[in-house]
């Protein structure tokens, strides 16, 4: 994926609810620092739904690609109000950006 394009997508579609930097604060959604390799529902100090806490998968390229296509299908009961990104290329760019920005 293209990190620069992914950053644009993040700013347009994600940044109103999420921060990415180390020590960034939780907004409507959790701060995403340390996302890769972490289990669902584990950002410290954020109040998750039981659905997110009990999903039990680890965030990586594949799980994020699937989740970001249709969040409510992947984690029924999530409170993330986001329809998803249908275009595979756009998701690949976003995941590339998240990988670089959150670690």
UniProtKB/Swiss-Prot annotation:
GO terms for molecular function: electron transfer activity; heme binding; metal ion binding. Keywords: Acetylation, Electron transport, Heme, Iron, Metal-binding, Mitochondrion, Respiratory chain, Transport. Gene3D superfamilies: Cytochrome c-like domain. Pfam families: Cytochrom_C (PF00034). Electron carrier protein. The oxidized form of the cytochrome c heme group can accept an electron from the heme group of the cytochrome c1 subunit of cytochrome reductase. Cytochrome c then transfers this electron to the cytochrome oxidase complex, the final protein carrier in the mitochondrial electron-transport chain. Belongs to the cytochrome c family. The keyword Transport applies. This is Cytochrome c. Coiled coil: none annotated. It is found in: Mitochondrion intermembrane space. Heme c binds at residues 14, 17-18, 80. It comes from the Eukaryota.
């Amino acid at each position: 994926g293209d990190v620069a394009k992914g950053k644009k997508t993040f700013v347009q579609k994600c940044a109103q609810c999420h921060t990415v930097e180390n020590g960034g604060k939780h907004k409507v959604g959790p701060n995403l620092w340390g996302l890769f390799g972490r289990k669902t529902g584990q950002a410290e100090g954020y109040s998750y739904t039981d659905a997110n806490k009990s999903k039990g998968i680890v965030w990586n390229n594949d799980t994020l690609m699937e989740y970001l296509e249709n969040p409510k299908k992947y984690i029924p009961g999530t409170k993330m109000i986001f329809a998803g990104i249908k275009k595979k290329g756009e998701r690949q760019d976003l995941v590339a950006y998240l990988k670089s920005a959150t670690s």
